[in-house]
Amino acid sequence: MATLLDIEGTVCSISFVHDILFPYALEKLPQLLKNEQFPIKPGGNQTSDLTPYLESFPEEYKQSAQALEDHVIDLTEKNVKAPYLKALQGYIWKSGYQSGEIKAPLYPDAVDYMKRVVDGGNKVFIYSSGSVPAQKLLFGYSSAGDLTPLISDYFDTVNAGPKMEAASYTTILKAIGFEADRVLFLSDNVREIEAAKKAGLRAYVAERPGNAKLTPQEKEDNVIKTSFEGIEI
């Protein structure tokens, strides 16, 4: 058996991502861009660790530091889950986690659940719109310490696909080698839950403080969990 976990609004609060992580990346970006040579060109003279992340941006935003910064601000404000943005954010967050400026405040019941799953001989997998490197940082530098030994693998929109499409969950099932009915998915997003169900997974909606309010119909159509205490996979 296995459990597949979303992150934002499921194992940690939405406010951590929107109020801590996103602003941190925006604050650090201008100084980082000062060390880059614009326009950014593939195979150019840039040699910094940041350059490969910037090369993934659309051409029109690589002409100047201001254009790129404005684009990042726009995507962040609109919460657009573009893979190239997520990769850049993960790169910037890495220094914050490693310096101790950032520590992911995971819900204690989520941490306990992950430990129970693994102690029971089962597996934990992560599926988030945040990049896989960013996911590893979040669990590696959490309020409960380094939880990466508990996690068997990580999935994002690059290696699995969009979270609201059933095909993405089928891709994950093939990668982890489990039948659909042997995997429990937990997420705060009802559309993700619906997509997972279409792929045959069992799926519960996480209802956490600060999450989007569920409609009466959504509550009727889904299993709702306000805590992971007592959840058995």
From Swiss-Prot:
Reaction(s) catalysed (UniProt annotation): 5-methylsulfanyl-2,3-dioxopentyl phosphate + H2O = 1,2-dihydroxy-5-(methylsulfanyl)pent-1-en-3-one + phosphate
Any one of the GO CC terms: nucleus
Cofactor note: Binds 1 Mg(2+) ion per subunit.
Binding site for substrate: S128, S129, K163
GO biological process terms, semicolon-separated: L-methionine salvage from methylthioadenosine
Signal peptide positions on this chain: none
Subcellular location: Cytoplasm; Nucleus
SUPFAM superfamilies the UniProt entry points to: HAD-like (SSF56784)
Superkingdom assignment: Eukaryota
Enzyme Commission number(s) from the entry: 3.1.3.77
InterPro entries with a match to the protein in the record: Enolase-ppase_E1, ENOPH1_eukaryotes, HAD-like_sf, HAD-SF_hydro_IA, HAD_sf
Cofactor(s) needed for function: Mg(2+)
Short name of any one Pfam family annotated for the protein: Hydrolase
CDD domains: HAD_EP
Keywords recorded for this protein, A-Z: Amino-acid biosynthesis, Cytoplasm, Hydrolase, Magnesium, Metal-binding, Methionine biosynthesis, Nucleus
Gene Ontology MF terms: acireductone synthase activity; magnesium ion binding
Pathway: Amino-acid biosynthesis; L-methionine biosynthesis via salvage pathway; L-methionine from S-methyl-5-thio-alpha-D-ribose 1-phosphate: step 3/6; Amino-acid biosynthesis; L-methionine biosynthesis via salvage pathway; L-methionine from S-methyl-5-thio-alpha-D-ribose 1-phosphate: step 4/6
Keyword Ligase belongs to the record: no
Residues that hold Mg(2+) according to the record: D6, E8, D188
Subunit structure: Monomer.
Family: Belongs to the HAD-like hydrolase superfamily. MasA/MtnC family.
Cross-referenced NCBIfam families: enolase-ppase, HAD-SF-IA-v1
Protein name (Swiss-Prot/TrEMBL): Enolase-phosphatase E1
Species of the source: Yarrowia lipolytica (strain CLIB 122 / E 150)
Gene from which the chain derives: UTR4
